[in-house]
């Protein structure tokens, strides 16, 4: 018989096994599941020791379960031919599910810029929604502090850095991929994110044509030029 897993401050939770086919990925999951070296090592570990940490899931209609934490473990187990995986079932609201999903993934050893950017944005959106609710519906921490400050405390980045990451979600996919591939550096990418979509696409064409990447100072000048053009076009 499986021993219950006790979470601090929570009631006892049982670990049960559920068929993989009944598990669905979290619909707003910003973290990529790749067949890379880390996945290979995870498969080796599961093959040798089994799944040591159960997946966290929540029930959804039609007898299925949405994965909150454990997308990579589920993928590795599936590749190894597992039919069932150990899970802990939690009944969570949509917003609490997002917070739990983001927090459980942000502490991974390797996270891409885009994953972190969209994770921070998801968490920021939820915390801002919670701050607009009645006091009885949210904890005191959410009421006292800005959402950016809460993310900063939880994740270790400064509030300014959290804002920079969130701004990256405004990059077009092709530019964001160049950032993840470390073709563009972080700080220039933050400046480029302030450009309109059509401006980013024109810049991308220029980069490809010249086979060159803008430096921070160049990206800042491009951003300032964009802002000045906006002011010129505004009616007086």
Feature names for model-found ranges:
Residues 228-236:
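Residue-level detector of conserved catalytic or cofactor/ligand-binding positions
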Residues 1-90, 96-110:
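Short, charged/polar connector segments at secondary-structure boundaries
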Residues 31-32, 39-40, 75-170, 180, ...:
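Amphipathic, charge-rich alpha-helical segments that serve as recognition/docking helices
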